[in-house]
Structures are given as structure tokens and as C-alpha cells.
Amino acid sequence: MLPWKHALRTLSVLLLTAAATLAPTASAQAAAAPSRGWNDFSCKPSASHPRPVVLVHGTFGNSVDNWLALAPYLVNRGYCVFSLDYGQLPNVPFFHGLGPIEKSAEQLDVYVDKVLAATGAAEADLVGHSQGGMMPRHYIKFLGGAEKVNALVGIAPDNHGTTLLGLTKLLPYFPGVEKFISANTPGLADQIAGSPFITRLNEGGDTVPGVTYTVITTKYDEVVTPYRSGFLDGPNVTNIVIQDKCALDLSEHVAIGTLDRITFHEVTNALDPVRATPTTCASVIG
């Protein structure tokens, strides 16, 4: 094999492998099972938690696997919780978030309307992991979501794209790779730092008035790099590094969104700031 072809294949594998780490570690078979305790469209928000919470999975995720820990955590605290699948590709079961992100935002638009109609609420709160923390910003900014969303909580979101530890900067040196990614997994191409999608998303400001934004990151993120690129700039933004709450928290990109109860506690603080309590290492047992 010619050296450049070997390098091309290696880079392709590295890119897809790095992107695959966005997937939760739970078995994909769980996606075939119904969610328990959430996605209950008979749930009516309470006076203490008047808005339904919509969970938005990350790349290679789905509406069940991504939320096997966080959804019950929120349900047990009195929230009406819902989750959707989006960004599906033909003949690719379980692993979603791979389609064009603009189309995924349209799917979110339809789903939020469905949740609001079922619950009778005027607004929803959105909590997303990785792409799921970034994609709703397109919905809020361009599809009228600002009128329907009170708060967006992004867990390790790639709000300004990612370099995948610098790998994406090598794409111009390998003819065909970028075209291959765009054609086969447009949702990945959209997340590359400097992509047309990311550029348009952030033009004119990161945020929209009337929506509260919270970003929770980890300094051990190996997918959204640099990790502070997930931060947003705006008067209605709280940017958090989870290690500032607990220096012992070693969560990386996947764990922070799927397993980390310290992060979960910070999510509830963002959803209900009036009743917020300090997040510490002890929050893991809260």
C-alpha cells in the first residue's frame, strides 16, 4: 500500500474512532427496550417543576442508552422527563445523531411541540450531551425555539466545534477524507471546528435573549477539544468546569454525560436555580 493511502486509511479510522467515543458505554440493545420512568406522555409538570425536561443525546447515541442514569435521576426528583431520537441514517439502527444537524434541529422542533402539547406547559427545559448540547442552539436561534425554551443545559457540548485533538486540522492533507465524512456522516462533518454549520451557528453571538444557558465541561474531555471551546459567551450564560466543583472528578467526555452524579447535581441546579445547593464531591451520593 502506498504511504499516503496508508495514512489516509489511518486518519479515517482515527476520526471515526474518536467520534465513536461520543457513544455511551451501555449496550445498544437497550435502545430496543422502552424507557422506564420517562417518556410518559401522561406526566403533568408540578408547581415545583413546571417545565418538562427534554433530553437530547449525543453523536452515536439514542434516546435510551444515553440517559439510563440521568433520566431516572431527574424523574426521582419530580421532573417530567422526555427524550428523542434524531439524526438517524438509513440502515443504521441504535446509533443516531449522524445526519445533517440542521435536519436534526427540525426533529427537535417537532418533538418539543409534542411534549408541550402533551404536558400543557408553555416552555420546556433542554438538557443535552455533546452534539445534543450544541444542536438545540440552532433550534433556538433559527427555528423559533427561543419562544418555547426556558433553559438549555449543555454537558460537554461542542459549541464551537472540535479539532478532535488536532486530527481535523490534518484533513486538507488527505484528499477524499473530508468528502467521505461529509457524504456519509454529515453530522460529524458539521461538528468540525470551522465548518459552515458551526460558523453560521455562532455568527452574531452565541446566545439568544430570553433563554438561560448552562455549559458543564470536563478538563479531561478527549473529544471536544480544547474543552473550553464548549463555553458560551453571553450575559445569560454560566460556564462550569466540573473539576472546579470536585477536583477528584475524573469524568471524560462520555462519563460526564452518562454516569457522573456530580454533573447531574449541577444539572438540577441549572433547572431549578431557586432551590440550588452547592455542588461538591459529596454530590455523588446525593
Residue spans of the language-model regions?
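Secretory targeting and sorting signals
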Residues: M1-A30
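Composition-driven, intrinsically disordered low-complexity tracts enriched in small residues
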Residues: A28-A47, A117, H160, L165-T185, ...
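Short, surface-exposed "cap/lid" segments of acyl-processing enzymes
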Residues: F41-P90
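Extracytoplasmic/secreted proteins, especially bacterial periplasmic and envelope-associated proteins
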Residues: R51, L55, D65, A69, ...
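Serine-dependent carboxylesterase/thioesterase catalytic core
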Residues: V56-H57, V81-L84, E102-N202
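Second-shell loop/turn segments in exported
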Residues: G58-G61, P93-G99, P186-L188, S251-G257
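Glycine-rich "HGGG/HGxG" loop immediately N-terminal to the catalytic nucleophile
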Residues: D85-L98, T163
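C-terminal catalytic-base region of ester-bond hydrolases, centering on the histidine
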Residues: F174, T207-G286
